[in-house]
């Protein structure tokens, strides 16, 4: 590796926009490392980070209000290029001597920006740009040294630039896909104006992570709780590539997994990739602990506590393990930092998302803590993990523990596993699996009358759930074809003895959540 992948970096200051993480993901997509910090960061931290460019994000506040967030003055004294997006443009304008006013008419949705002049931010782009607006305030007077480089019918300063100082402001959101050439604009800023190179690639991330793991753990042994989920699977592959047999994975089968999932994990990581795996069959222990518990939160906590106990017992058997590997990813770090300090820039701090016991005297190895989920998946592919595993629908941490409503019983889990497997199999067969964002089956602990042959019988009910969403914050129920739903229902009722009725959940989020519990 000729260059350190962290040498060239962009700093994104977060003013609270729902799109801020998307800005960071786009910069990474371009091939440049970036970090996301709170707007009220100290000057010393920015100096230490030493960015090649700074992006000021959007945000929900109004620059015209007292005490609304401002960029640290050092941002404009540092001599590096600055791009202000939406609120970021407004605070840039106001802080550098321009004027912002509250507009009578909000601009929300698509808009056409007429580009004027020759600005580096619009290099190689046409004179009219389709963009996505979402703002109430607008810049009415630009600071000295700036020129107007874009306008819409209702927004006189849709983009402004001080080419000499390399300050740019856009009133729209280049990070969202609705802005047709938004990625090109961000490339113009990051690669052209800031002069960064594309050093941040899947191959270089893997190379860097492996080198850092080797340096961190030396000849010590490492233990990892392998769940078969995306994050822990990618951590397993990275750490194994770095230290080989000095990694031991502990796979706890809690009896709440999908059909044949336990065997699939062992086949893939043990047989195919040759990792050391200890499989703990803890189904009885989990089910015993869950007896009589029907409250979803209580079930979640119980499952978490039992997992910690089992993992702790296994780790104590591995006397030489000095390090614990975890699948913490960057959004976990941002969320944890923000909730603890209000500032999202403590990327180096330990963030024990696994909730493992405090008295585990081990160092933490967290090779994914700089990565977004889409980056984790990409490096998983590069490491040889199958696409179907990396891109399958989300599965909750407590597993079927929150998909069996009410009390958990082995009978219910077994019925649900088989019904869910049929639903997922049919989605794949009909080429619908990748057209929905998440699909699963829920077990309802109610009996319903059914007719089989000449007899009536009372059996259980399951609900199918499929949603379409971009961010999982809001979701629409998926309009699956009636014929398809009919086929799934027939198969489940005929093939899973004990289920007599199948329903389809047509609730959106909000008001409903995606999972039932």
From Swiss-Prot:
User: Keywords for this entry?
Assistant: ATP-binding, Glutamine amidotransferase, GMP biosynthesis, Ligase, Nucleotide-binding, Purine biosynthesis
One of its Pfam families is GATase
Keyword Nucleotide-binding assigned: yes
> Which residues constitute the catalytic centre?
86 (nucleophile), 173, 175
Q: Which residues form the GMPS ATP-PPase domain?
A: 200-392
Enumerate the spans annotated as Glutamine amidotransferase type-1 domain. 9-199
Q: Which GO terms describe its cellular component?
A: cytosol
Binding-site residues for ATP, renumbered to this chain: 227-233
What is an example of a GO molecular function annotated in this UniProt entry?
A: GMP synthase activity
Under the heading CDD domains, the entry gives: GATase1_GMP_Synthase, GMP_synthase_C
Tell me, how does this one assemble? Answer: Homodimer.
What is the stated purpose of this protein? Catalyzes the synthesis of GMP from XMP.
Q: Which NCBIfam families match?
A: guaA_Cterm, guaA_Nterm, PRK00074.1
Q: What is this protein called?
A: GMP synthase [glutamine-hydrolyzing]
């Amino acid at each position: 590796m000729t260059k350190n992948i962290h040498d060239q970096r962009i700093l994104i200051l977060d003013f609270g926009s729902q799109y801020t993480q998307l800005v960071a993901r786009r910069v990474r997509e371009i091939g440049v490392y970036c970090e996301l910090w709170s707007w009220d960061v100290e000057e010393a931290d920015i100096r230490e980070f030493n960015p090649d460019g700074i992006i000021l994000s959007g945000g929900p506040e109004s620059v015209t209000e007292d005490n609304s967030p401002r960029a640290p003055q050092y941002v404009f004294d540092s001599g590096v290029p600055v791009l202000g997006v939406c609120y970021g443009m407004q605070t840039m304008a106001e802080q550098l001597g321009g004027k912002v006013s509250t507009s009578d008419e909000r601009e929300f949705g698509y808009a056409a920006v007429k580009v004027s002049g020759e600005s580096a931010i619009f290099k190689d782009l046409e004179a009219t740009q389709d963009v996505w607006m979402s703002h109430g305030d607008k810049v009415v007077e630009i600071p000295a040294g700036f020129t107007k480089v874009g306008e819409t019918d209702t927004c006189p300063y849709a983009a402004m630039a001080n080419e000499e100082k390399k300050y740019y402001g856009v009133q729209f959101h280049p990070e969202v896909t609705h802005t047709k050439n938004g990625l090109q604009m961000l490339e113009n800023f990051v690669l052209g104006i800031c002069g960064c190179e594309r050093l941040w690639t899947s191959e270089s991330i893997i190379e860097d992570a492996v080198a850092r793991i080797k340096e961190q753990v030396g000849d010590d042994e490492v233990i990892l709780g392998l769940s078969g989920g995306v994050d822990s699977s990618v951590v397993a592959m990275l750490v194994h590539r770095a230290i080989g047999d000095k990694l031991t994975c502990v796979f706890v089968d809690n009896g709440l997994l999908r059909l044949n999932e336990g065997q699939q994990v062992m086949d893939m990581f043990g047989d195919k990739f040759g990792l050391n795996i200890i499989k703990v069959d803890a189904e009885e222990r989990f089910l015993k602990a869950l007896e009589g518990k029907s409250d979803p939160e209580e079930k979640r906590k119980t499952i978490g506590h039992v997992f910690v106990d089992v993992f702790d017992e296994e780790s104590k058997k591995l006397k030489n393990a000095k390090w614990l590997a975890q699948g913490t990813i960057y959004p976990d770090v941002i969320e944890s930092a923000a909730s603890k300090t209000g500032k999202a820039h403590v990327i180096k701090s330990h963030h024990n998302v696994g909730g493992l016991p405090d008295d585990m005297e081990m160092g933490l190895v967290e090779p994914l803590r700089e990565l977004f989920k889409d980056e984790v998946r990409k490096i998983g592919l590069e490491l040889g993990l199958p696409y179907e595993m990396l891109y399958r629908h989300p599965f909750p941490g407590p597993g079927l523990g929150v998909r069996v409503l009410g009390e958990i019983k082995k009978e219910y889990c077994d019925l649900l596993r088989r019904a869910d497997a049929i639903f997922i199999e049919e989605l794949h067969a009909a080429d619908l699996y990748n057209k929905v964002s998440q699909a699963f089956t829920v077990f309802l602990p109610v009996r319903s009358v059914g007719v089989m042959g000449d007899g009536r019988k009372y059996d259980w009910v399951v609900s199918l759930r499929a949603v379409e969403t971009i961010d999982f914050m809001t979701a629409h129920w998926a309009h699956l074809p009636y014929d398809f739903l009919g086929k799934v229902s027939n198969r489940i009722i005929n093939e899973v003895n004990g289920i007599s009725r199948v329903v389809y959940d047509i609730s959106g989020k909000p008001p409903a959540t995606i999972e039932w519990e």
